[in-house]
Amino acid sequence: MSHHWGYSKHNGPENWHKDFPIANGDRQSPVDIDTATAQHDPALQPLLISYDKAASKSIVNNGHSFNVEFDDSQDNAVLKGGPLSDSYRLIQFHFHWGSSDGQGSEHTVNKKKYAAELHLVHWNTKYGDFGKAVQQPDGLAVLGIFLKIGPASQGLQKVLEALHSIKTKGKRAAFANFDPCSLLPGNLDYWTYPGSLTTPPLLECVTWIVLREPITVSSEQMSHFRTLNFNEEGDAEEAMVDNWRPAQPLKNRKIKASFK
């Protein structure tokens, strides 16, 4: 049953706990970021993002989003600094989005939903590989970036132009020479808290770093995301929309801010 999770009524986030009991755990993601209670922590360092040698390889429809995958066999694209004590290697990025522009993000800010959310997924190199890292409480660092409606994003355009070739689950296409820096906002102020993967197996292995400044995307660009399908080729067509998990209880955690 575990591989049948999704985002519909019968297999969506409300039901994930049946197969993945950690869904009700103490450090689940996403969360609502309440800016009034997030505490500025002067000890937090600036983020150090070195994506200059990032080697993108392919773009894949996995039936719940699409991943742009990177060569993580060496330190090509690295995230460190911020709340992190170690160096983390970029393995993939993906997005979550809505059926309309009024929803789609997983994290919310004072309950406000953005049109989409970008997740750049990195693993802690001290654990040797991604599979080992996800078993550790400090195994992953995920950089979350909100997408809000405004002027079109040039960086995003190259990604969107590849989507026609991966319309259905299981499709994969080559996707080289993409610079993930083109998806970063100008300001790297962030919130950070300990959390989890937002999709099954929902492992509690993520240091979340959510940027305060969104990037902008046009409404027309957003509509491209919705041309993808959850289903495999030849099956009944199900538009890939609303592939986001709602905010989870913060429980005993504190959200820290890198800015005043």
UniProtKB/Swiss-Prot annotation:
Gene3D superfamilies: Alpha carbonic anhydrase (3.10.200.10). One of its GO terms (molecular function) is carbonate dehydratase activity. The keyword DNA repair does not apply. GO terms for cellular component: apical part of cell; axon; basolateral plasma membrane; cytoplasm; cytosol; extracellular space; microvillus; myelin sheath. One of its GO terms (biological process) is response to steroid hormone. Its cofactor is Zn(2+). The active site is at 64 (proton acceptor), 67, 127. Inhibited by acetazolamide. Its EC number is 4.2.1.1, 4.2.1.69. Interacts with SLC4A4. Interaction with SLC4A7 regulates SLC4A7 transporter activity. Interacts with SLC26A6. This is Carbonic anhydrase 2. It comes from Mus musculus. The gene is Ca2.
